[in-house]
Amino acid sequence: MVLDKEEGVPMLSVQPKGKQKGCAGCNRKIKDRYLLKALDKYWHEDCLKCACCDCRLGEVGSTLYTKANLILCRRDYLRLFGTTGNCAACSKLIPAFEMVMRARDNVYHLDCFACQLCNQRFCVGDKFFLKNNMILCQMDYEEGQLNGSFETQVQ
């Protein structure tokens, strides 16, 4: 997926007295001590919003996406311009805005990212093995190795 632009919302320092900027959202002068800048325009904190859902994007640390001169939140950007795919475990569609897990070229719903033999869900830091597009926990992988069922590489 290619973004036109993804940017953090910079909170600019105190603006110089006598040189107040105009807000691109409401066209009023920004009299606040701080102002925001996005798409090379200045905004009140309350005026910088997603063009689709009107959620506020002016909070410190928030990220906004721009495409075709629209300012969007992550969810709406992915809904409008993101790509969807199918889960490698259940084959159901994964919406573009949904969080996923990846193992090589495979993409999984978070709930589907589990050993496909014993259904043990993986936690951060757990070892897992990928064999014939199946995700295996360490115990099932080692059991398969002892039985001579398969060989694969550690992920």
UniProtKB/Swiss-Prot annotation:
LIM zinc-binding domain segment(s): 21-83, 85-147
Pfam family, one: LIM
Keywords from the named record: LIM domain, Metal-binding, Nucleus, Repeat, Zinc
One GO location term (cellular component): nucleus
Example of a GO MF term: transcription coactivator activity
Superkingdom of source: Eukaryota
One GO term of the biological process aspect: positive regulation of transcription by RNA polymerase II
Alphabetized InterPro entries for the sequence: LMO_RBTN_TF, Znf_LIM
PROSITE patterns in the cross-refs: LIM_DOMAIN_1 (PS00478), LIM_DOMAIN_2 (PS50023)
Disulfide bond residue pairs: none
Compartment(s) where it occurs, according to its Swiss-Prot or TrEMBL record: Nucleus
Role description: May be involved in gene regulation within neural lineage cells potentially by direct DNA binding or by binding to other transcription factors.
Protein name: Rhombotin-1
Gene field: lmo1
